[in-house]
């Protein structure tokens, strides 16, 4: 049995898609376990760029099974569109498996997400407005509609009708907007269900069988630890658990089945949406990193907020996710910056904090304590090993590993898979 979980150690957008794609080459099964189409990842395959939001990045390899796990919330309309997008470009999706227990995002979830964000005004969370939160709310309230329900015409009709009564009351009485009619949703979404029916099964069985047979299984997290609903910067978080522990619930495999956890980080920090960000840059260096690193959201197109690397954040991620291996991305983006900074702790009212605080009020008063390191000017985009890095670049990478307490296993010096280098195998 060899299982690897890939998690983001920051606020998402760390380059997990690329690392998952890279690790997929040696995996036999690739599974997603949480989130929905609020996450976007860009994969370069055979020289072409593909943007995926729902389907695991291993889909490009016909001999590998790709799983959408039970912990995900699935927008059937978006999924059918993504399947068509791949088919039009000649990519087969016969290797896809969708959990019959995954929950379904429906039009009223999208509408409620949008309206609630508007209602909050200055206190908005900064959601992607993809209906993720409202769908997870229905799941917790035990009124959600699952994929297995979507495939059964009678069950879907009954549950949808019941939910619409409640949602329409909410839309009309609280938000003052028109509700939805059953006939405007039912046939369209039932057809989406029929379109994906051939992929639907009990994916927990698929995954556990693969693990029991000793096959290599890769679990692909979306977002990042700092967006985890329990461990992140609550309430500026997603509605699921991107931490490695989310695999056991969202994929239906026991905790004893997880062997390695790869924490993916950028050599700096980014964040999309609202919420605290202690090392955020509001100067020319921040603008430079954003432009060189092309820091714009895959899903939203929004410019990402940019800051220095924060070892307090990544240490927190290591602890709550049990991270065993570090994958450090986008080192090349920092080339040419004279002096680099790494946050080693926070200063709060004269105290030094080495652990990430739960209180946003405390966090708002925290000032980062920086360690300064000399930068480098050499082009590192063709580097294939740590030994080939300029001395200052290597020192920067090794210092991050020391400060976070995570051994370096992978480092990346560009967006292409050929620019991803292995220091030690995560499948060992």
Swiss-Prot record:
Organism this protein belongs to: Geobacillus kaustophilus (strain HTA426)
Transmembrane segments: none
Protein name (Swiss-Prot/TrEMBL): Adenylosuccinate synthetase
InterPro entries: Adenylosuccin_syn_GTP-bd, Adenylosuccin_syn_Lys_AS, Adenylosuccinate_synth_dom1, Adenylosuccinate_synth_dom2, Adenylosuccinate_synth_dom3, Adenylosuccinate_synthetase, P-loop_NTPase
Family statement: Belongs to the adenylosuccinate synthetase family.
Annotated IMP binding sites: 13-16, 38-41, 128, 142, 223, 238, 302
Catalytic activity: IMP + L-aspartate + GTP = N(6)-(1,2-dicarboxyethyl)-AMP + GDP + phosphate + 2 H(+)
Oligomer status and interactors: Homodimer.
Entry-linked Gene3D superfamilies: Adenylosuccinate Synthetase, subunit A, domain 1, Adenylosuccinate Synthetase, subunit A, domain 2, Adenylosuccinate Synthetase, subunit A, domain 3
Gene (name only): purA
Binding-site residues for substrate, renumbered to this chain: 298-304
Cofactor: Mg(2+)
A Pfam family matched in the record: Adenylsucc_synt
Repressor listed as a keyword: no
């Amino acid at each position: 049995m060899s299982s690897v979980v890939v998690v983001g150690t920051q606020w998402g957008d760390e380059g997990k898609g690329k690392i998952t794609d890279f690790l997929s080459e040696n995996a036999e099964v690739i599974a997603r376990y949480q989130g929905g189409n609020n996450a976007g990842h860009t994969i370069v395959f055979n020289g072409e760029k593909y943007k995926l939001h729902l389907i695991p990045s291993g889909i490009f390899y016909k001999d590998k099974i790709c799983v959408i796990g039970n912990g995900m919330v699935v927008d059937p309309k978006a999924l059918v569109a993504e399947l068509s997008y791949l088919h039009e470009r000649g990519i087969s999706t016969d290797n896809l498996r969708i959990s019959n227990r995954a929950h379904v995002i429906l039009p009223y979830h999208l509408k409620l997400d949008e309206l609630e964000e508007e209602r909050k005004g200055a206190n908005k969370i900064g959601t992607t407005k993809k209906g993720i939160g409202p769908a997870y709310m229905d799941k917790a309230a035990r009124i959600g509609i699952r994929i297995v329900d979507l495939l059964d015409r009678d069950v879907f009709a009954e549950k949808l009708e019941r939910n619409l009564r409640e949602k329409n009351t909410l839309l009309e009485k609280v938000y003052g907007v028109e509700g939805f009619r059953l006939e405007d949703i039912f046939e369209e979404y039932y057809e989406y269900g029929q379109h994906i029916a051939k992929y639907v099964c009990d994916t927990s069985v698929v995954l556990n069988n693969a693990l029991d047979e000793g096959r290599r299984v890769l679990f692909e997290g979306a977002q990042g630890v700092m967006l985890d609903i329990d461990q992140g910067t609550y309430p500026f978080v997603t509605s699921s658990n991107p931490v490695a522990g989310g695999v056991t619930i969202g994929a239906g495999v026991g905790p004893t089945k997880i062997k390695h956890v790869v924490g993916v980080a950028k050599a700096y920090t980014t964040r999309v949406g609202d919420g605290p960000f202690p090392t955020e840059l509001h100067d020319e260096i921040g603008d430079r990193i954003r432009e060189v690193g092309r820091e714009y959201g895959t899903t939203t197109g929004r410019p990402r907020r940019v800051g220095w690397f924060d070892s307090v954040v990544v240490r927190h991620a290591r602890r709550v996710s049990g991270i065993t291996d570090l994958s450090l991305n986008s080192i090349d983006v920092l080339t040419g910056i004279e002096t680099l900074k790494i946050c080693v702790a926070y200063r709060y009212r004269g105290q030094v904090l080495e652990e990430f605080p739960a209180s946003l009020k405390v966090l708002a008063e925290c000032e980062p304590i920086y360690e300064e390191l000399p930068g480098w000017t050499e082009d590192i985009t063709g580097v294939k090993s740590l030994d080939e890095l300029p001395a200052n670049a290597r020192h920067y990478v090794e210092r991050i590993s020391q400060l976070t307490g995570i051994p370096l296993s992978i480092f990346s010096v560009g967006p292409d898979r050929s620019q991803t280098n292995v220091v030690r195998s995560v499948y060992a």
